[in-house]
Amino acid sequence: TLFRSNVLPIEQDEKVTAMIHLREFPEDRYLVMVTRSGTVKRIQLSSIYTARKAGIRCITLDEGDELICVRETDGDQAILIVTHDGMAICFKETDVRCMGRDAAGVRGINLRPGDYVVGAARAKRDHQVLMITENGYGKRTDMDEYIRADGPQKRGGFGLKGYNVTEKTGPVVGVKVVSDEDDVLVINDAGVIIRMAAAGISTYGRTAQGVKIMNLEEGVKVISFARTDHEEEEEAAEGETPAGGPEQA
């Protein structure tokens, strides 16, 4: 409510999808937007600079569609899109031409009935693709399984199986690109958050089910997760306060 009233006046049925920290709006930087229905759009970062308090429209959405994620790019990256049913597609961002703010975008991934996009990320070689499911399962997969030797796929296809979704695992809730130096925060709909090292999550191929990474009580589901910088655990001697003072509540 505070964000809606003081920063960006949005409608009651709207919500903030992404926030990106920017200092400048150069001509050679871009925003890539991906929607729930698999549409992708690329615009120049400089085209959204505005002093208008009401903001500007950056994409025209079809009825029933919604913006899932926004990523800043340098114009020469690959984009990975992942769906609820575990399908994944990776293509060059240059496959998506730059458009004006009012354009609707183009097809990024074709979806089978009932499926929808849950996340997208900038693909990086020497990193891993992390997917986590509603029932607390997860896995890392080497990026090379998505970026072939001859380059990424072409946009607009059905993609490849990125997760073997079963009744046991539940559907995929999102995707992040991680390295061994990252940590991962996982949250469930009961409000419980756990933190773990990305390196501690096992690596499997695209068609594997992964392993249990969060124990859940009956009826509780994982709803989201985030990548964050790795935090070394420091063991303090008994009775001593760790360096830097006590952790704030």
Residue spans of the language-model regions?
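Short, structured "edge-of-domain" segments at secondary-structure transitions
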Residues: T1-A249
